[in-house]
């Protein structure tokens, strides 16, 4: 997966999302080093067993037009190299730079921010024209962008069903995209334990606390039975992924724990494409 686009458009968020899903990631890689990088990662490993995500943009100061030639050569060796291009409106980019107070990568040319953005659009146009997908992040927040990367690009092949286990806080609404929704507020709440309060459902202390609760074991067993029975029936559906969402009061302890637990179970059952997304945490 090749991640490119305008500075401030969300490329770093996308790469971090791929990394969280066990892609081997490298950012700001010069195009001319891409062939050697891929060869080094594939050496001794079948092509299908490797997931790579590479960030390429104007910071590398390399000839971006070389990428098309490399992608064609990679395809001949059975390597699928998809190119995602992230962009946003000038207004959105200027606001993001104002909020973060970071310098634009082309500011060393003595350009004001609007001019630097315009120049970067010109330099990255060769990448945009050959992109497999152009993602406009002008109206997306970080959580929405991460979710879109997970569901549309990171979960792999669209000819097989992928599973996304999501956690959320009811006080911020139920995810509109959820196919299954389970209420974890019926479970004991680690929030009331002062030592567990600052932790999340991914931490060992919270896991041990909930693992030792009989109601949690019963709740989990019943959900496992339901999902194991009905998820395989959806393989013949036209959808490419299914979202199973767990909600609790704050989206921090119980819902995160359940999403992670069910994702582990799905992987143990042999589902090839499984991801987690914690809306209030990621």
UniProtKB/Swiss-Prot annotation:
Keywords: ATP-binding, GTP-binding, Nucleotide-binding. ATP binds at residues 5-12. GTP binds at residues 57-60. The keyword Disulfide bond does not apply. One of its GO terms (molecular function) is ATP binding. InterPro entries: P-loop_NTPase, RapZ-like, RapZ-like_N, RapZ_C. Transmembrane segments: none annotated. Belongs to the RapZ-like family. Displays ATPase and GTPase activities. This is Nucleotide-binding protein XAC2976. It comes from Xanthomonas axonopodis pv. citri (strain 306). The lineage of its organism: Bacteria, Pseudomonadati, Pseudomonadota, Gammaproteobacteria, Lysobacterales.
């Amino acid at each position: 997966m090749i991640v490119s686009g305008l500075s401030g458009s969300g490329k770093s968020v996308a790469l971090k999302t791929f990394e969280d899903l066990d892609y081997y990631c490298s950012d700001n890689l010069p195009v001319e080093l891409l062939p050697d990088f891929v060869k080094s990662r594939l050496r001794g490993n079948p092509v299908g067993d490797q997931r790579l995500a590479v960030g390429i943009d104007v910071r590398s100061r390399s000839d971006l037009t070389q990428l098309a030639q490399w992608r064609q050569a990679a395809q001949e060796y059975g390597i699928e190299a998809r190119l995602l291009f992230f962009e946003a409106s000038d207004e959105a980019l200027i606001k993001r730079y104002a909020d973060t107070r970071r310098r634009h990568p082309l500011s060393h040319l003595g350009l004001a921010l609007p001019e630097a953005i315009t120049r970067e659009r010109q330099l990255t146009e060769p990448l945009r024209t050959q992109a497999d997908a152009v993602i406009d992040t002008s109206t997306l927040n970080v959580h929405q962008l991460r979710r879109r990367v997970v569901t549309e690009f990171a979960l792999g092949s669209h000819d097989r069903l992928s599973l996304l286990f999501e956690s959320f806080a009811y006080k911020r609404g139920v995810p509109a995209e959820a196919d299954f929704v389970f209420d974890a507020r019926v479970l004991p709440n680690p929030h009331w334990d002062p030592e567990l309060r600052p932790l999340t459902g991914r931490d060992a202390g919270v896991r041990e606390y909930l693992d030792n609760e009989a109601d949690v074991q019963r709740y989990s067993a019943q959900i496992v039975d339901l999902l194991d029975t009905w998820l395989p029936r959806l393989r013949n559906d036209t959808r490419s992924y299914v979202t199973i969402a767990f909600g609790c009061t704050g989206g921090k302890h119980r819902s995160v724990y359940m999403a992670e637990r069910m994702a582990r179970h799905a992987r143990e059952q042999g589902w090839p494409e499984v991801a987690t997304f914690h809306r209030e945490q990621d």
